[in-house]
Structure formats: structure tokens, C-alpha cells
């Protein structure tokens, strides 16, 4: 049985991974630890085989460029995971999984100009969130060796029942709008159960390295809004002819490019083993909305 400590009690991903691993009785013993304050330093890690570090400050538009928040991002997203990993290694933990982000690449995709992230794409974070995560990666990866395996996960948008963030905006569109722009774009996203299954496989394998999870299918924003509406028992009509207006609006409103641009991981970059996507895109939307 693998003994796992999730550092970051109450985090969406940590909570969902714990629930997912509970479906495999007798294989995993999972605990959570709140990382607020200094009390965690008194916790012994000697009873654990694996630490999954999910604690962190999430990406917030209101703070991502504010200089007043730079120190806080560094303390929580860089210094904390490094301190946890150092303690884990010193106390005999065998594997450390760090939840990073696609934002370490610092890429945006203006509508009509697709961007594909490959193994050769350099890191170029552009805000406090991305920079703090990239800085943590730079300090964690050299700690990896035969007895202490460090795995870095760089998920794109994560969604599932109870999630927050960008998916919530799509839910709002699907719930309120009778029509929605038809745009031919593609984006990488990952359903929480698919992410949890990858984490489970990484734990089973004692894997180390950098992993960029995504669903087996790229997401089209317009189709996803329509599918969410359908799962809610509504119908949203997709109407073409708005691309020029969205391109113009995207020049002034970054959120437009985030919603309708094409930003994807290369398939080969996301491959692992025989696969980890336990749910299709269609299945994941139905499960999220019901």
C-alpha cells in the first residue's frame, strides 16, 4: 500500500485526487495536511512514501501583475514547495509530485493564430503566478535522484464537478445565452478524473520528470458551451460570422483570446504509458453537469 500525503488540504485537485484514489481499496492510504502557518514543519513525513503538493496561490487576474503580491506568490508557490520537498527528502519520502501549471510557458494565442506547445517550447512566464511556479520547478528538479523521485505536472485548464475558474465562465454562458459565437478553435483541457488517473499511474510507477496532461480530445469553446447547455437540458444556437469582431475585441480584452484562441499541448508531449484518460470529453461534461 502506498502512503500518500497531500500537502494543501481543501484544494480542489487534492480533494478530488483523494476521492479518486479511494476507489482503489487497499492500494492507497491518503492523508491531507493544511499548510497555513509554520505548524506543518512539526509534522513527520517519515510515515509517507509519496507527497503530492497542491498548496498554492491560484492564478488571479487582480493580482497576477501587481508588484505588491510578488513576494506572496514567491513565498507560497516557490519557497513553500521547495521547503516541503527538502524536508521530505531528508525524512525518506520516495516521491514528490508538484502541481505546476501551463502558465510557465507564458503563452497566449490570439484568435486565428494557433499555438502548439511541444517538448522544445521554452519556459517564458509573464506573471507572478507563472514565474513563481517556474522558479519552484527550477529548484525541485535538481533534487530528483534514484531515491527521491520528483514529478512536475503542468496541467492546462482543469475542470470537473465543483471546479472554479475558466470552466465556470463556460457554464455561465451555457446557462444564460440563447446564442453563442461559432468559432473554430482548439484548446487543451483536462478533466479532473483524467488528471487523477495520471497522478495514480505516476505514483504506482514511482515516476520522475515533467508531465503535461490533457484530455484525449482538444476542446472547441463553442462546441463545449453547446454540450454543457445540452447536459443542462438547454439549447444554445451556435452562430457564425463573429470571428472578425472577436479578433478586434481580443486586441483590447485578453479574456477573449483566452476563450477563443487555440492553445494546445502536442499529443506526444502529453502521452504516458498506455493512456490515462478514463473519460471522454463528452462523458466528462455530462458527469460535471449532472
Language-model features, listed with the residues they occupy:
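N-terminal Rossmann NAD(P)H-binding glycine-rich loop of SDR-like oxidoreductase domains
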Residues: 3-23
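NAD(P)H-binding glycine-rich loop region in Rossmannoid oxidoreductase-like domains
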Residues: 37-90, 105-107
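Active-site Tyr-X1-5-Lys
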Residues: 124-151
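Glycine/proline-rich active-site loop of Rossmann-fold NAD(P)-dependent oxidoreductases
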Residues: 134, 147-148, 158-169, 201-211, ...
Amino acid at each position: 500500500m502506498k502512503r500518500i500525503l497531500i500537502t494543501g488540504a481543501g484544494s480542489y485537485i487534492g480533494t478530488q485526487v483523494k476521492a479518486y484514489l479511494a476507489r482503489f481499496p487497499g492500494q492507497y492510504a491518503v492523508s491531507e495536511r493544511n499548510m497555513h502557518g509554520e505548524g506543518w514543519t512539526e509534522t513527520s513525513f517519515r510515515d509517507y512514501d509519496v507527497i503530492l503538493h497542491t498548496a498554492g496561490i491560484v492564478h488571479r487576474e487582480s493580482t497576477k501583475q501587481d508588484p505588491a503580491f510578488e513576494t506572496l506568490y514567491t513565498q507560497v508557490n516557490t519557497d513553500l514547495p521547495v521547503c516541503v520537498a527538502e524536508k521530505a527528502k531528508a525524512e525518506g519520502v520516495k516521491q514528490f509530485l508538484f502541481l505546476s501549471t501551463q502558465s510557465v510557458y507564458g503563452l497566449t494565442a490570439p484568435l486565428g493564430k494557433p499555438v502548439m506547445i511541444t517538448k522544445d517550447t521554452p519556459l517564458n512566464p509573464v506573471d507572478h503566478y507563472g514565474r513563481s511556479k517556474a522558479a519552484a520547478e527550477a529548484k525541485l528538479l535538481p533534487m530528483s535522484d534514484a531515491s527521491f523521485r520528483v514529478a512536475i505536472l503542468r496541467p492546462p485548464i482543469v475542470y470537473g464537478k465543483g471546479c472554479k475558474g475558466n470552466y465556470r465562465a463556460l457554464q455561465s454562458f451555457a446557462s444564460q445565452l440563447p446564442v453563442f459565437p461559432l468559432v473554430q478553435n482548439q484548446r487543451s483541457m483536462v478533466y479532473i478524473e483524467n488528471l487523477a488517473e495520471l497522478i495514480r499511474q505516476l505514483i504506482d510507477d514511482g515516476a520522475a520528470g515533467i508531465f503535461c496532461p490533457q484530455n484525449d480530445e482538444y476542446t472547441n469553446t463553442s462546441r463545449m458551451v453547446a454540450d454543457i447547455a445540452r447536459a443542462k437540458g438547454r439549447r444554445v444556437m451556435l452562430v457564425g460570422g463573429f470571428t472578425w469582431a472577436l479578433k478586434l475585441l481580443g486586441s483590447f480584452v485578453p479574456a477573449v483570446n483566452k476563450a477563443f484562441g487555440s492553445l494546445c499541448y502536442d499529443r506526444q508531449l502529453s502521452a504516458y504509458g498506455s493512456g490515462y484518460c478514463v473519460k471522454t470529453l463528452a462523458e466528462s461534461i455530462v458527469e460535471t453537469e449532472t
